[in-house]
């Protein structure tokens, strides 16, 4: 969970987000080294009194500044491709959850359960309990089992939306008439917050997402309770 004067990415709860954080650090280190080298060369050019006005070509230097950037790009591309293919791999998900964006709320459908669907609206400020977060709480939290691969299907009923939960490393566009999919998982129980990340109208900032990851037994109990209530 983010907090005031928080700097950096949110704490990861999924293997995907852990990989993204590692890739971020890897790329940032490369950028830092390149920036340091460029600043050093600029400072040397501004302070040195040596000149080479007679130099017409330098084949060795040209080879170096052609090969070195190619190596750096490969060092960035390989881990990026690995994460890209990992996030697109769906190997027997435990359940499928469909998220549909509306102006301005989310609706969820559990495809593996009978009649398990609900709408999730932002919680009005005057209904908040002590310790709850303004503009982030919802009336119906999305409960999911931890340590399970969950396939997300994301779509929209009206305009473009984007379903995003930073701690889980998930961000997928919700496009009318189209289904996008993403893999979701959590290695620990808890509450994880997200928001619509695509400007979708005047109440765009009032479309929070709350995921509640729990143990398998608690999730099945919750699903059974909702089914009984819906009868």
Swiss-Prot record:
Cofactor: Cu cation
Self-association and partners: Component of the cytochrome c oxidase (complex IV, CIV), a multisubunit enzyme composed of 14 subunits. The complex is composed of a catalytic core of 3 subunits MT-CO1, MT-CO2 and MT-CO3, encoded in the mitochondrial DNA, and 11 supernumerary subunits COX4I, COX5A, COX5B, COX6A, COX6B, COX6C, COX7A, COX7B, COX7C, COX8 and NDUFA4, which are encoded in the nuclear genome.
Entries under Gene3D superfamilies matching the protein: 1.10.287.90, Cupredoxins - blue copper proteins (2.60.40.420)
Transmembrane segments: 15-45, 60-87
Species name: Brachyteles hypoxanthus
The keyword Nuclease appears for this protein: no
GO biological process: ATP synthesis coupled electron transport
Top-level EC class as recorded in UniProt: translocase
GO annotation, cellular component aspect: mitochondrial inner membrane; respiratory chain complex IV
Topological domain ranges for the Mitochondrial intermembrane compartment: 1-14, 88-231
Role of this protein: Component of the cytochrome c oxidase, the last enzyme in the mitochondrial electron transport chain which drives oxidative phosphorylation. The respiratory chain contains 3 multisubunit complexes succinate dehydrogenase (complex II, CII), ubiquinol-cytochrome c oxidoreductase (cytochrome b-c1 complex, complex III, CIII) and cytochrome c oxidase (complex IV, CIV), that cooperate to transfer electrons derived from NADH and succinate to molecular oxygen, creating an electrochemical gradient over the inner membrane that drives transmembrane transport and the ATP synthase.
Protein's name in the database: Cytochrome c oxidase subunit 2
Keywords: Copper, Electron transport, Magnesium, Membrane, Metal-binding, Mitochondrion, Mitochondrion inner membrane, Respiratory chain, Translocase, Transmembrane, Transmembrane helix, Transport
Nuclease is among the record's keywords: no
Annotated cofactor note: Binds a dinuclear copper A center per subunit.
């Amino acid at each position: 969970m983010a907090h005031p004067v928080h700097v950096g990415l949110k704490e990861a709860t999924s293997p995907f987000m852990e990989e993204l954080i590692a890739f971020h650090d890897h790329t940032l280190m490369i950028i830092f080294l390149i920036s340091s080298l460029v600043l050093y060369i600029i400072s040397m050019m501004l302070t040195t009194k040596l000149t080479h006005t007679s130099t017409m070509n330098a084949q060795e230097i040209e080879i170096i500044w052609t090969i070195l950037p190619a190596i750096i790009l490969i060092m960035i591309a390989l881990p990026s491709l690995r994460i890209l293919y990992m996030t697109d791999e769906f190997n027997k998900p435990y359940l499928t959850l469909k998220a549909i964006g509306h102006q301005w709320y989310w609706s969820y459908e559990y495809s593996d359960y009978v009649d398990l669907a609900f709408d999730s609206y932002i919680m009005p400020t005057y209904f908040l309990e002590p310790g709850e977060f303004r503009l982030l709480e919802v009336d119906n939290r999305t409960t999911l089992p931890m340590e399970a691969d969950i396939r997300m299907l994301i779509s929209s009923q009206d305009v473009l939306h984007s379903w995003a939960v930073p701690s889980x490393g998930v961000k997928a566009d919700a496009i009318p008439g189209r289904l996008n999919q993403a893999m979701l998982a959590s290695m620990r129980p808890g509450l994880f917050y997200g928001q619509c990340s695509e400007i979708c109208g005047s109440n765009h900032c009032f479309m929070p997402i709350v995921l509640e990851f729990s143990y398998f037994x608690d999730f099945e109990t919750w699903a059974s309770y909702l089914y009984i209530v819906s009868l």
